[in-house]
């Protein structure tokens, strides 16, 4: 078996590479715009330093590939607002390049990393795949466009596709120093250094956190199960407040950190929760929980 991971030097992509590198031939295509080659240290993979917009490079990477995991993207919401045209070029045109070449080369399936951001700030929870998307940013719009392109290719018989809408993914190799870093790596970094942990607003915002290794397992499941086609939520279906997340991390780190409150951030969604029943009913079962994932992440630092 041969797999191609676009964006495979990134946080989630590198975990897919780690999952497959002993059981499959793994090709990673990444221009290291936000990915890091150190994420692939010790992994038996073929690395191609190139953009998904480079048709020749994508064609070379695609030779003999059975399954494509399309992780490459502009992943920062604020950056997408600052540079919407570049976001569209990378996230939509880049995906189209990969889809076309995957179809031409005879790849069996493409699994696309979509996002819960497509739901927007409509307050109804849990989020179900049948709900009308309401993207609020160029990033979210690009992910919805990507889903539509995947569906179009599948409906026309060019290549099977599955799109997984990631909720709040966390785990090892998530960068706490990024300008757009997620809560878990920031909280862990500060807790391990006994620094204050900042909560925006009252900290009662809730999220559906999902461990990266279950994200990888779900992507692998989607790739190899013929019946898994279309769009699926990927979360645990569990609500966790940002305040309780911080408390759990402080306790795990045996830290003296305390929480401080700042003003709410404009545009922040108050509550986000997946309905994962569609994916679960297809046969996927998580192997981790928020608690076990946090513990393993902490131990990796």
What are these regions (language model features)?
Residues 52, 132, 171, 204, ...:
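Residues that form or immediately flank small-molecule/cofactor binding pockets and catalytic motifs
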Residues 1-169, 213:
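N-terminal Rossmann-like NAD(P)+-binding domain of SDR-like oxidoreductases, especially those catalyzing
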Residues 11-17, 39, 54, 77, ...:
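Short, electropositive, low-hydrophobicity segments enriched in small/polar residues
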Residues 124-125, 136, 148-208, 212-223, ...:
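NAD(P)-dependent short-chain dehydrogenase/reductase
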Residues 191-301:
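C-terminal substrate-binding subdomain of Rossmann-fold SDR/epimerase-dehydratase oxidoreductases
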């Amino acid at each position: 078996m041969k797999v191609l991971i676009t964006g495979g030097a990134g946080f989630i992509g590198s975990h897919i590479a780690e999952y497959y590198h002993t059981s499959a031939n793994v090709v990673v295509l990444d221009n290291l715009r936000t990915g890091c080659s150190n994420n692939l240290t010790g992994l038996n993979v073929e690395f191609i330093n190139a953009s998904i917009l480079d048709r020749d490079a994508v064609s070379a990477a695609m030779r003999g590939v059975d399954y494509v995991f399309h992780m490459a993207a502009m992943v920062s919401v604020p950056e997408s607002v600052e540079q919407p045209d570049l976001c569209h070029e990378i996230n939509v045109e880049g995906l189209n390049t990969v889809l076309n070449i995957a179809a031409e080369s005879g790849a069996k399936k493409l699994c696309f990393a979509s996002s819960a951001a497509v739901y927007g700030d409509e307050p109804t929870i849990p989020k179900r795949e049948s709900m009308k998307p309401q993207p609020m940013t160029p990033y979210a719009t690009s992910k919805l466009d990507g889903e539509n392109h995947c569906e179009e290719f599948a409906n026309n018989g060019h290549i099977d596709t599955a799109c997984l809408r990631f909720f709040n993914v966390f785990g090892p190799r998530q960068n706490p120093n990024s300008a757009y870093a997620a809560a878990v790596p920031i909280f862990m970094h500060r807790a391990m250094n006994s620094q204050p942990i900042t909560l925006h607003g009252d900290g009662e915002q809730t999220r559906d956190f999902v461990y990266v290794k279950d994200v990888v397992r779900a992507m692998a499941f989607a790739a190899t199960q013929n019946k898994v086609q279309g769009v699926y939520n990927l979360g645990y279906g569990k609500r966790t407040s940002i305040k309780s997340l911080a408390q759990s991390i402080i306790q795990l780190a045996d830290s003296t950190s305390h929480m401080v409150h700042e003003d709410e951030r404009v545009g922040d969604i108050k509550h986000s929760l997946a309905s994962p029943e569609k994916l679960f009913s297809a046969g996927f079962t998580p192997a981790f929980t928020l608690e076990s994932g946090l513990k393993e992440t902490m131990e990796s630092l």
